[in-house]
């Protein structure tokens, strides 16, 4: 059977083995007659991928690709976002947001290889992920059809989805009495739904799967030293590490101290607010350490402008327009700012908090001879008078005008 473009009637599905994508395989076959090729991206979720080969085939897929993209995930998506200092709405470290463009990119590559006419995903019609998947496909392969079952079928809730799965003897890793929606990768673990849908409900300690609840964390702080080269972390406690290993090791250390828990109500791109609880231990430490190094190495004008750029960068990533020319242009600016962001940062981890405990850099702009409160021989305090007179001249001129005109 051939599609309109002459390709085999195949669809490549972004597959996780979770509830949504487990039921999408039979649904695509029943409603579209597609041959379903599943693709699961190994983003660092570990043992969750082990049973997917058998599960996807048993559910009706003809083939499954399990793609190890961890290295690319860190070097091409996480590090640029870290260097930019991009944080969405002051809290969210974008763990799901920048994973989706990578998954969609790989879907496109497999679709080309297999001669598929369509790509399918399990994102709901209420969320941001549908936008992130589909904008990436539009940017990289505008001719491919996109199938989004949650916008088409009669299933209206996770409970309906569980019923659909059970009717077809499809095992799913959720229970009806606790149907959290979770997304896990090397960078973070997110939790949404169930009792979290009320912002008044405090997350229970048994929710956390990575981080130790802060009140149960060790009573003694732990110090970590992170070395950066041009904004990229390269050593942890003096040990040179690759990008994936850096995050894995720091995750274990920081999570043990309850660092990295984020509970927030965020503004979704599609217009509604949602509540999520995120566990991002390594990311929380790396962002804080990177920022401390920038305090030393960036001048005032560059730092302040970069802060504005970081806000826009975070919006671009969150909104799913990773492949927009503006993000690439901002990357070029950020790379210039990071040329001197090289040095060593010491951070203290204690019961959920991460605080700076020292920083040094060969490119530090902090000069003790100028900054000291003690006696110095390099700064003439009399010079400040002329600076103040010139800097304050516009304010003085306006005040004189207001006095003369009676406005004051």
Swiss-Prot record:
The lineage's top-level taxon is Bacteria
Looking up Gene3D superfamilies in the UniProt record yields: Argininosuccinate synthetase, chain A, domain 2 (3.90.1260.10), HUPs (3.40.50.620), Single helix bin (1.20.5.470)
Q: According to the UniProt record, what class of enzyme is this?
A: ligase
Main localization (coarse):
cytoplasm
Q: What is one Gene Ontology biological process annotated in the Swiss-Prot or TrEMBL record?
A: argininosuccinate metabolic process
Which positions are annotated as binding ATP?
A: 14-22, 41, 122
**One Pfam family matching this protein:** Arginosuc_synth
Catalysed transformations (reactions): L-citrulline + L-aspartate + ATP = 2-(N(omega)-L-arginino)succinate + AMP + diphosphate + H(+)
Pathway recorded for this protein: Amino-acid biosynthesis; L-arginine biosynthesis; L-arginine from L-ornithine and carbamoyl phosphate: step 2/3
Write the Enzyme Commission number(s) for this entry.
Answer: 6.3.4.5
Location in or out of the cell? Cytoplasm
Task: Provide the binding site for L-citrulline.
Answer: 92, 97, 128, 132, 181, 190, 266, 278
Give the keywords, sorted.
Answer: Amino-acid biosynthesis, Arginine biosynthesis, ATP-binding, Cytoplasm, Ligase, Nucleotide-binding
Q: Which InterPro entries match?
A: Arginosuc_syn_C, Arginosuc_syn_N, Arginosuc_synth, Arginosuc_synth_CS, Arginosuc_synth_type_1_subfam, AS_cat/multimer_dom_body, Rossmann-like_a/b/a_fold
Protein residues bound to L-aspartate: 124, 128-129
**Recorded GO terms, molecular function?**
argininosuccinate synthase activity; ATP binding
PANTHER family per the UniProt record, alphabetical: ARGININOSUCCINATE SYNTHASE (PTHR11587:SF2)
Protein family per UniProt: Belongs to the argininosuccinate synthase family. Type 1 subfamily.
Give the multimer and partner information: Homotetramer.
Which named protein is this? Answer: Argininosuccinate synthase
| Gene symbol of the encoding locus | argG
């Amino acid at each position: 059977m051939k599609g309109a473009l002459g390709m085999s009637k195949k669809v490549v599905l972004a597959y996780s083995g979770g509830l949504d994508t487990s039921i999408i395989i039979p649904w695509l076959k029943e409603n579209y007659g597609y041959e379903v090729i599943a693709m699961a991206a190994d983003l660092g979720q570990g043992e969750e991928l082990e049973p997917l080969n058998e599960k996807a085939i048993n559910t009706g897929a003809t083939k499954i690709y399990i793609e190890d993209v961890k290295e690319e995930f860190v070097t091409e998506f996480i590090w640029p976002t870290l260097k930019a200092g991009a944080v969405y709405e002051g809290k969210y470290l974008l763990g799901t947001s920048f994973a989706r463009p990578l998954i969609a990119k790989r879907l496109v590559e497999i679709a080309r290889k297999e001669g598929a006419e369509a790509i399918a995903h399990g994102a709901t019609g209420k969320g941001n992920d549908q936008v992130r998947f589909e904008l990436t496909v539009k940017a990289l392969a505008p001719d491919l059809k996109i199938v989004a079952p949650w916008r088409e079928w009669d299933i209206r809730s996770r409970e309906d989805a569980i019923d659909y799965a059970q009717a077809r003897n499809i095992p799913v890793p959720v229970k009806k009495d606790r149907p959290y929606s979770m997304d896990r990768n090397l960078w973070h673990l997110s939790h949404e739904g169930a009792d979290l849908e009320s912002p008044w409900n405090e997350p229970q300690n048994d929710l956390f799967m990575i981080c130790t609840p802060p009140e149960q964390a060790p009573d003694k702080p732990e110090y970590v030293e992170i070395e950066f080269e041009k904004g990229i972390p390269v050593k942890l406690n003096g040990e040179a590490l690759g990008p994936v290993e850096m995050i894995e090791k720091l995750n274990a250390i920081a999570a043990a101290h309850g660092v990295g828990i984020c509970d927030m109500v965020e503004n979704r791109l599609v217009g509604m607010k949602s509540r999520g609880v995120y566990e991002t231990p390594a990311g929380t430490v790396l962002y804080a350490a990177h920022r401390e190094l920038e305090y030393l190495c960036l001048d005032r004008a560059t730092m302040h402008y970069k802060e504005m750029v970081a806000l826009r960068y975070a919006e671009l990533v969150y909104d799913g327009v990773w492949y927009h020319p503006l993000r690439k242009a901002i990357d070029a600016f950020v790379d210039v700012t990071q040329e001197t962001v090289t040095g060593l940062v010491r951070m203290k981890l204690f019961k959920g908090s991460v605080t700076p405990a020292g920083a040094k850099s060969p490119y530090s702009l902090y000069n003790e001879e100028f900054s000291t409160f003690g006696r110095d021989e390099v700064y003439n305090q009399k010079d400040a008078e002329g600076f103040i007179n010139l800097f304050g001249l516009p304010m003085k001129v306006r005040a004189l005008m207001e006095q003369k005109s009676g406005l004051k």
